[in-house]
Swiss-Prot record:
This is Ribulose bisphosphate carboxylase large chain. RuBisCO catalyzes two reactions: the carboxylation of D-ribulose 1,5-bisphosphate, the primary event in carbon dioxide fixation, as well as the oxidative fragmentation of the pentose substrate in the photorespiration process. Both reactions occur simultaneously and in competition at the same active site. The keyword Lyase applies. Substrate binds at N123, T173, K177, R295, H327, S379. The active site is at K175 (proton acceptor), H294 (proton acceptor). CDD domains: RuBisCO_large_I. It is an enzyme of class 4 (lyase). Mg(2+) binds at K201, D203, E204. It comes from Phalaenopsis aphrodite subsp. formosana. PROSITE patterns: RUBISCO_LARGE. Gene3D superfamilies: Ribulose bisphosphate carboxylase, large subunit, C-terminal domain, RuBisCO large subunit, N-terminal domain. It comes from the Eukaryota. Transmembrane segments: none annotated.
């Protein structure tokens, strides 16, 4: 009898409730190369042993329910059940444990992030035996990742499309994010692109509101792109947000963007949903559009240390679902992000093979095989004085996005773009000459500002602006 059809009917059925750990806690289990592995931060309720809590997570996110059922005998639970195979204490935290769970690959539909998350982070997060639960990391085996298309194009194809190499790309989110007419919005796009930026961007909540309908915005932004390209000789783009109330409307907007000949569209992948995002990513690959991803709503899921899901999991899911850019924090700006933890998931977005490194929050070695990489976008409260640190932290394969740091320039939008482009070129040149950006960054910016009045004005405006808050997202003590 094949494992798929093997049953346990001959064993007999015994009704009642039994501890999860009797079936789902298997410390002797040797994980398979095809298993999806998960690391959960578990906070059990008082009186619940960690082994029972870890087993409950494995059970409720795979084949288990609260009581034994007749139909258990109609399948092979040993083939399909999740297994909690290891538990470790979190040093420095009261009543917290890392529970490692292995899931057989047959539990998941091929090419569906939606189905994967419905199982792994579904009802189990409301389980009463747990005070809190957080998914820290996933190991996606190549046998599963190869069922996904992944990013529409990836880093190298994007650089070839833009004909831009050897430096980070520069962007700007148009502000105010809401309230501008389409024509005034397009004017701001033109001024920023003409000044030297590679991209401008719709904010995440710009969709199709009464003050600016999407079709009008697309038309004026396309006009701005073509005008700026003609004047600068560079390929330009604007992230046209195609996010909509239905998948059909979203694809309609992407089709219109393609007909206009613009290079890139945008999607809010968490509020829009993984099914919609994957559909849009497939359309973008088939039609030559780059896809920029915004992570609006992520902090609702990932901000708390003991409950929810770490952003590195959302980043892996996005790489599988599809996107060419994704916002990833700045380390130095106004948004949450500790350096090593941020670089941990940045590597998971960009690199082919990432080694386990608990000091950076990476619980498992991840092999993406041939899946294209995603460009991280640093955005949020950054300005010209941050340019050396951003260039040093994120490297060439990144987008550095200055919204207020462009549009807040005292001389206007185009001079703000000029200031950022001059600062970036100065940092890249200094790095290529062997200078230490971390140590000499301020001197590099000051030297460049002597030859650029636009940069000098920006330096004066933002010389004392800092965001000095202690990040929540830090590695555990034992992982250092």
């Amino acid at each position: 009898m094949s494992p798929q059809t093997e049953t346990k009917a001959s064993v007999g059925f015994k009704a009642g409730v039994k501890d999860y750990k009797l079936t789902y806690y298997t410390p002797d289990y040797e994980t398979k190369d095809t298993d999806i592995l998960a690391a959960f931060r578990v906070t059990p309720q008082p009186g619940v042993p960690p082994e029972e809590a870890g087993a409950a997570v494995a059970a409720e996110s795979s084949t288990g329910t609260w009581t034994t059922v007749w139909t258990d005998g109609l399948t092979s639970l040993d083939r399909y059940k999740g297994r909690c195979y290891h538990i470790e204490v979190v040093v420095g935290e009261e009543n917290q444990y890392i529970a490692y769970v292995a899931y057989p690959l047959d539990l998941f539909e091929e090419g569906s992030v939606t189905n994967m998350f419905t199982s792994i982070v579904g009802n189990v997060f409301g389980f009463k035996a747990l005070r809190a639960l957080r998914l820290e990391d996933l190991r996606i085996p190549p046998s599963y990742s190869k069922t996904f298309q992944g990013p529409p194009h990836g880093i190298q194809v994007e650089r070839d499309k833009l004909n831009k190499y050897g430096r980070p790309l520069l962007g700007c989110t148009i502000k105010p994010k809401l309230g501008l007419s389409a024509k005034n919005y397009g004017r701001a796009v033109y001024e920023c692109l003409r000044g030297g930026l590679d991209f401008t961007k719709d904010d995440e909540n710009v969709n199709s509101q009464p003050f600016m309908r999407w079709r009008d915005r697309f038309l004026f932004c396309a006009e701005a792109i073509y005008k700026a390209q003609a004047e600068t000789g560079e390929i330009k783009g604007h992230y046209l947000n195609a996010t909509a109330g239905t998948c059909e409307e979203m694809i309609k907007r992407a089709v219109f963007a393609r007909e206009l000949g613009v290079p890139i569209v945008m999607h809010d992948y968490l509020t829009g949903g993984f099914t919609a995002n994957t559909s849009l990513a497939h359309y973008c690959r088939d039609n030559g559009l780059l896809l920029h991803i915004h992570r609006a709503m992520h902090a609702v899921i990932d901000r708390q240390k003991n409950h929810g899901m770490h952003f590195r999991v959302l980043a892996k899911a996005l790489r599988m679902s599809g996107g060419d850019h994704i916002h990833a924090g700045t380390v130095v700006g106004k948004l949450e992000g500790e350096r090593e933890m941020t670089l941990g998931f940045v590597d998971l977005l960009r690199d082919d093979y990432i080694e386990k490194d608990r000091s950076r929050g990476i619980f498992f070695t991840q092999d993406w095989v041939s899946m294209p990489g995603v460009i991280p976008v640093a955005s949020g409260g950054i300005h010209v004085w941050h340019m050396p640190a951003l260039t040093e932290i994120f490297g060439d394969d990144s987008v550095l996005q200055f919204g207020g740091g462009t549009l807040g320039h005292p001389w206007g939008n185009a001079p703000g773009a000029v200031a950022n482009r001059v600062a970036l070129e100065a940092c890249v040149q200094a790095r290529n000459e062997g200078r230490d950006l971390a140590r000499e960054g301020n001197d590099i910016i000051r030297e460049a500002s002597k030859w650029s009045p636009e940069l000098a004005a920006a330096c004066e405006v933002w010389k004392e602006i800092t965001f000095d808050f202690d990040p929540v997202d830090k590695p555990d003590i034992e992982a250092k």
